[in-house]
Amino acid sequence: MAFILGSGSPRRLDLLAQLGITPDAVRPPEIDETPAKGELPRAYCTRISREKVAAVEAGPDDIVLCADTTVALGRRILGKPADADEAARFLRSLSGRRHRVITAVAVRRGGRLWERDVVSQVKVKRLSEGEISAYLTTGDWQGKAGAYAIQGPAGAFVPWISGSFSAIVGLPLAETAVLLAAAGHSKFKGDT
C-alpha cells in the first residue's frame, strides 16, 4: 500500500508532516478547474476534490488524498488570480468584509471514497491601496485562491477567523486524520 498525495501544494505537504505523514508519491492531477455556470462555491469545491482524486493513477490498495480550497464571497468563487490586476480586484472585494474559505478533502482507496468539507469564516480588515500595492509586490498572491495565503504576509490583513486554520491554509488536519483512518492508513491503525 502506498500513500499518494494528489497535490503540488507545498502547504499540504507541510500540513501532512504535522500529522507525521510523508507521502510515498506526489502526483498532482491535471483537471479542468473551471466552475460550471451558476455553480455554488461549496458544491464546486466538493466536485473539484472528487475529480482530482479520481484523476490520480493508483494501485487498488493505494490511498490517494486530494483537496481543493475555494475562497467564496457570497455566491462568488474567487479562484487563483490570473495576474496582479485580478489579484488587486480580489483584494479590494475582500477588504473590510467577511468571506468563506471552503476546503474539501477526498480520500480514495480502490473503489471506495471518503470525503469531507470544512467551511471557515475569515474577516479581512479594510485595506488601503498602498497595502494592496505593497502586498502585490511580494508575489505571495500567485497561485493562491482569493489572491492571499493566511500563513504568509497577508496574515496581517486577517484580524479574525472562525473555523479551522489548517483548512484555510489548505488541509483540515482533524478531518483529514479521520478520513485517512477510515481508509486504513497505517499511521492510524488502532485509532478507529
UniProtKB/Swiss-Prot annotation:
GO terms for molecular function: dTTP diphosphatase activity; UTP diphosphatase activity. Its cofactor is a divalent metal cation. InterPro entries: ITPase-like_fam, Maf-like. Its main location: cytoplasm. The record marks 11, 69, 151 as: Important for substrate specificity. It is found in: Cytoplasm. GO terms for biological process: nucleotide metabolic process. The active site is at 68 (proton acceptor). It catalyses: dTTP + H2O = dTMP + diphosphate + H(+); UTP + H2O = UMP + diphosphate + H(+). Its EC number is 3.6.1.9. One of its GO terms (cellular component) is cytoplasm. Keywords: Cytoplasm, Hydrolase, Nucleotide metabolism, Plasmid. Nucleoside triphosphate pyrophosphatase that hydrolyzes dTTP and UTP. May have a dual role in cell division arrest and in preventing the incorporation of modified nucleotides into cellular nucleic acids. PANTHER family: BIFUNCTIONAL DTTP/UTP PYROPHOSPHATASE/METHYLTRANSFERASE PROTEIN-RELATED (PTHR43213), BIFUNCTIONAL DTTP_UTP PYROPHOSPHATASE_METHYLTRANSFERASE PROTEIN-RELATED (PTHR43213:SF5). Belongs to the Maf family. YhdE subfamily. This is dTTP/UTP pyrophosphatase. It comes from Ruegeria pomeroyi (strain ATCC 700808 / DSM 15171 / DSS-3) (Silicibacter pomeroyi).
